[in-house]
Amino acid sequence: SQLTITDSEVGSSKIYCEVRRGESLWIKEIPDCKGDIVHPTVILTQTSSEEITSSRFATVVCSIIDFHPEAITVNWLKDGHPMESGFVTSPACETNGNFSATSRLTVPAREWFTNTVYTCQVSHQAATQSRNITGSPDSSECNHPAIKLLPPSIEQVLLEATVTLTCVVSNAPYGVNVSWTQEQKPLKSEIAVQPGEDPDSVISTVDISTQAWLSEAVFYCVVSHQDLPTPLRDSIHKEAWKDLREPSVSVLLPPAEEISAERFLSLTCLVRGFSPREIFVKWTVNDKSVNPGNYKNTEVMAENDKSSFFIYSLLSIAAEEWASGASYSCVVGHEAIPLKIINRTVNKSSGKPSFVNISLALLDTVNSCQ
């Protein structure tokens, strides 16, 4: 025989089991079972956004703690609808007379950050508890792949037959594919590599002709991955600049008192009045390149009219080298210069710095003007 009572009736009065057989009668009092029912504590936890991005899956753990008796039912809902798969519930384990269990839900990363509500529903002794969790779309935006395109250096554009475009993909998932196209034409590019300092980024480069870059053709970096609904694309091209302005270049000699008193001297190259802002400035000594660590270029800054720019370069040299008669040249490259490169050379014999325009072909054999 079986008797079903509600939770509220447990302990409200004494319960007896009565058995008759012929003239015989047995009566048994049923012990109060109120203390035997302990409803569980239900807690939901999830993996971090970083783990979701790297593993491409979100894991939600529903912890069901300290319940008695053992019988329990766990269901998962997605936006209020029962789920048939994607979760595993472990058998209950007994500790100090009570039971605990866990249910683990796994969701693909592409579904997690879509504002979907997942519910762990726990039923125990006719009582049901529900806990909800939502993948935040705001969090996902920080972890979506992002594309940054870098143009070639102005020095490469002015001096070389080919230039390099760079595509940096941050928050890149494992196995991401990066490709390049010119308009709709696929380009052969270097395989994307992950730099050691940022394991969540990949870098892809493509070499194109300088002529193609100067033609203002449009180049696309395309990022694809199985977790992306559609490939990501970004474009880069050389911007047309109508107001070209050629820079003026002057080298300031060290003052006489500095030459006689100091072990190290400073030469200053002032480049101003140019537009657009892309420019390179470097130094040579006796027609050989100076180590970039020996000079410092300022940032390119706008002049008062806001339509042109200027930059300083400061070269530190040993006083004895200056005294030996070495020739120092400030070499400036800019697209508005007719031959692309301009060179100013000074030495200890210079009353004023000399001025030379040099072609690309002669750059490596710059001759000092006396």
UniProtKB/Swiss-Prot annotation:
Keyword tags: Glycoprotein, Immunoglobulin domain, Repeat
Transmembrane segments: none
Glycan attachment positions: N98, N132, N177, N343, N347, N357
Domain Ig-like positions: 40-134, 145-237, 247-347
Pfam family, one: C1-set
Tagged with keyword Chaperone: no
UniProt entry tagged with the keyword Phosphoprotein: no
Protein name (Swiss-Prot/TrEMBL): Ig heavy chain C region
Organism: Heterodontus francisci
